[in-house]
């Protein structure tokens, strides 16, 4: 059975949680392979809203194995809070249903502090980070001073690693007139949480390989979107990890995954949280309508999302960087009330024309979209579950997106509930 990868093709918030939840019915295990608790997934099941940030969406399904790979920046306190919150909903996780990679770098209080300090220092050039410490945690990982989950097993060696970590972080704190953090503070932070997270620690790569050899279906759940990828996104307004499908092998520690079915998700329009270029952004009535109908507020941060028309140029490039074999269009119903719908087919910048997204930020900031206008359908698609439920103009719109992006659309999401999904090629 082929592995399934679900990734975003925009700036995140494409509805990956809902699609992973829907696909996980036929999967045996779901793995998060990058990001941290700065990314949120919302799933509506039987009228109840579940908001997840670290845990794979499969925790909402019975008898599914959920795993977190080493590519994830793991905030142990955030993880425990999330596990505890699910208990209130009658969902109980144990080491047989949730596995954490031994190599996960841990997000600590000093990382959140560093995130806030650096964002403050950027002033008007701020990136719009969530200040949850994800970026500084990844910096420490690359700098070979991160505390990893497996380090919690031995307090003696852990103390030496904490000293190394603080020798770096206290430099920043001294330079910005902040109080230095003592090793005992970090040791207390870690030793208190260790008994709650260590029971979940398992050799995740070995488990994944074993499942694949048994012919089981493993689903890999991405966070954020390709346009936020540290290498392929709208740098520097990006996240601190690789969000494209190719990172699955690195973030899980398994090189031989066999055939991969890559589903790239995109909203029927575009949204973005935080700062950065956004060529198709709409700040008037259209953007307001998308915001209100789409309820475009961040799951984790409650920040308002910027809204605009579908950008086929950037989505095509994102599909290319992730090797998307299928596309999933979400929130089609948000466009139900719009008379004419625009799609960006190329960019202009001065005398130049671009059919791709240039890497240079000074060009990205000046790009002007060239639009193609398509007729709306002015009919409700909310809750549609079959292709025949969709108006002709809605089907034509989806077909045009397929042509422009160059990837077939296999699923269309038409509402918040987990069953509001239209298979386009049943």
UniProtKB/Swiss-Prot annotation:
Ligand binding (IMP)? 13-16, 38-41, 130, 144, 224, 239, 303
Q: What is this protein called?
A: Adenylosuccinate synthetase
Report the GO terms under cellular component: cytoplasm
Which reaction(s) are listed as its catalytic activity? IMP + L-aspartate + GTP = N(6)-(1,2-dicarboxyethyl)-AMP + GDP + phosphate + 2 H(+)
> Which family is this protein grouped under?
Belongs to the adenylosuccinate synthetase family.
Chain sites annotated for binding substrate:
299-305
Q: What is the lineage of its organism?
A: Bacteria, Pseudomonadati, Pseudomonadota, Alphaproteobacteria, Rickettsiales
Subunit structure comment from the entry:
Homodimer.
A GO molecular function annotation here is: magnesium ion binding
List of catalytic residues: 13 (proton acceptor), 41 (proton donor)
Protein biosynthesis keyword on record: no
Q: Which UniProt keywords apply?
A: Cytoplasm, GTP-binding, Ligase, Magnesium, Metal-binding, Nucleotide-binding, Purine biosynthesis
- Principal place of residence: cytoplasm
Q: Which pathway is this protein engaged in?
A: Purine metabolism; AMP biosynthesis via de novo pathway; AMP from IMP: step 1/2
Q: Which gene encodes it?
A: purA
EC class (word)? ligase
**What cystine linkages occur within this chain?**
none
Look up the signal peptide feature and give its range: none
Keyword Ligase set for record: yes
Q: Which residues bind Mg(2+)?
A: 13, 40
């Amino acid at each position: 059975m082929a592995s399934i990868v679900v990734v975003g093709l925009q700036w995140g918030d494409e509805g990956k949680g809902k699609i992973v939840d829907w696909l996980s019915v036929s999967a045996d295990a779901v793995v998060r392979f990058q990001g941290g608790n700065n990314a949120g997934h919302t799933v509506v099941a039987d009228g109840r809203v579940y908001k997840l940030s670290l845990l794979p969406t499969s925790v909402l399904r019975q008898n599914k194995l959920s795993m977190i790979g080493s590519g994830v920046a793991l905030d142990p306190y955030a993880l425990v809070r999330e596990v505890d919150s699910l208990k209130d909903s009658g969902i109980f996780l144990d080491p047989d249903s949730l596995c954490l990679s031994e190599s996960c770098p841990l997000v600590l209080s000093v990382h959140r502090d560093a995130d806030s300090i650096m964002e403050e220092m950027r002033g008007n050039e701020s990136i719009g980070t969530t200040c949850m410490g994800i970026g500084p945690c990844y910096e420490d990982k690359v700098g070979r001073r991160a505390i990893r989950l497996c380090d919690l097993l031995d307090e003696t060696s852990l103390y030496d690693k904490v000293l190394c970590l603080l020798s770096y972080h206290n430099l920043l704190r001294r330079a910005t007139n902040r109080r230095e953090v003592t090793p005992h503070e970090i040791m207390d932070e870690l030793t208190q949480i260790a008994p709650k997270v260590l029971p979940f620690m398992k050799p995740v790569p070995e488990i994944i390989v074993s499942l694949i050899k048994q012919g089981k279906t493993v689903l890999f759940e991405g966070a954020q979107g390709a346009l936020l990828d540290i290498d392929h996104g709208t740098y520097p307004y990006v996240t601190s990890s690789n969000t494209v499908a190719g990172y699955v092998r690195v973030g899980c520690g398994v090189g031989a995954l066999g055939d991969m079915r890559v589903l790239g998700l995109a909203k029927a329009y575009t949204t973005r949280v935080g700062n950065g270029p956004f060529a198709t952004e709409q700040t008037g009535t259209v953007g307001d309508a998308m915001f209100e109908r789409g309820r475009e507020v961040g799951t984790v941060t409650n920040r308002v999302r910027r809204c605009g028309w579908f950008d086929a140029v950037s989505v095509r490039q994102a599909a290319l960087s992730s090797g998307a074999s299928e596309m999933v269009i979400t929130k089609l119903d948000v466009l139900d009330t719009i008379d004419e719908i625009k799609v960006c087919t190329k960019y202009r910048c001065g005398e130049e024309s671009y059919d791709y997204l240039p890497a240079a930020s000074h060009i990205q900031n000046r790009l002007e979209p060239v639009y193609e206008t398509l007729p709306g359908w002015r009919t409700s698609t909310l809750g549609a579950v079959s292709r025949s439920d969709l108006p002709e103009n809605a089907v034509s719109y989806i077909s045009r997106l397929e042509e422009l992006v160059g990837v077939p659309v296999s699923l269309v999401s038409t509402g918040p509930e987990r069953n509001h999904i239209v298979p386009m090629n049943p």
